[in-house]
Amino acid sequence: MRPLLALLLLGLASGSPPLDDNKIPSLCPGQPGLPGTPGHHGSQGLPGRDGRDGRDGAPGAPGEKGEGGRPGLPGPRGEPGPRGEAGPVGAIGPAGECSVPPRSAFSAKRSESRVPPPADTPLPFDRVLLNEQGHYDATTGKFTCQVPGVYYFAVHATVYRASLQFDLVKNGQSIASFFQFFGGWPKPASLSGGAMVRLEPEDQVWVQVGVGDYIGIYASIKTDSTFSGFLVYSDWHSSPVFA
């Protein structure tokens, strides 16, 4: 009987889990044991939350002055400003020179002659009455324009011994024609004519008798034949001073 009981107790002891001495209640506690050895490092934990924003720091000291930048593009033009006040009246300037308008005039007559002139050629009026500017040539009987503008020319002719027809000619082209019949009267007759014409520098004007028998221009002591012309107005806006 005893051997059987001993085997039973031995089996129970081997099949039960070992008991921790520290967990067995005891009426008389013992002294604390020695500290155990440190354990191994554990795995890294989860990241923590962001911390709160800190307070603004104090302003820093001013930095050094930087280099100047490139000039910018010109801006748009501004609106005109208000009109300023009138300035003081200036001093009176020196007196200027009076300008003289351009001049051109002449008058000439034929010398006494009883010989008829040739036809279709310039008729000279060789005795100059006025030619201050020298624009008329008494040798050729031609007027040469020096001042551009409008001119008036006139011819007063004595008609005797034959009928007379003459032209005012500009550069070889007739600009006006005049005629006087002579009927064998005992005294001379007269023929006058004139015209206005625009001339440019170097244009020429003269008198020319007609063809055939119409060459009865005459001159004597008491019966003159004259050719005259003068500038009516100039085309120059700013004319120089002419003597």
UniProtKB/Swiss-Prot annotation:
The keyword Nucleus does not apply. Residues 1-15 form the signal peptide. It is found in: Secreted. GO terms for molecular function: identical protein binding. Residues 99-238 form the C1q domain. GO terms for cellular component: apical plasma membrane; bicellular tight junction; cell projection; collagen trimer; extracellular region; extracellular space; lateral plasma membrane; membrane. Its main location: secreted. SMART domains: C1Q. InterPro entries: C1q_dom, Collagen, Collagen/C1q_domain, Tumour_necrosis_fac-like_dom. GO terms for biological process: inner ear development; protein secretion. Keywords: Collagen, Secreted, Signal. Residues 30-95 form the Collagen-like domain. Residues 15-124 are annotated as: Disordered. Homotrimer (via collagen-like domain). May form higher order oligomers by supercoiling of the trimers. May interact with ERFE. PANTHER family: COMPLEMENT C1Q TUMOR NECROSIS FACTOR-RELATED PROTEIN 5, EMILIN ELASTIN MICROFIBRIL INTERFACE-LOCATED PROTEIN ELASTIN MICROFIBRIL INTERFACER. This is Complement C1q tumor necrosis factor-related protein 5. It comes from Rattus norvegicus (Rat).
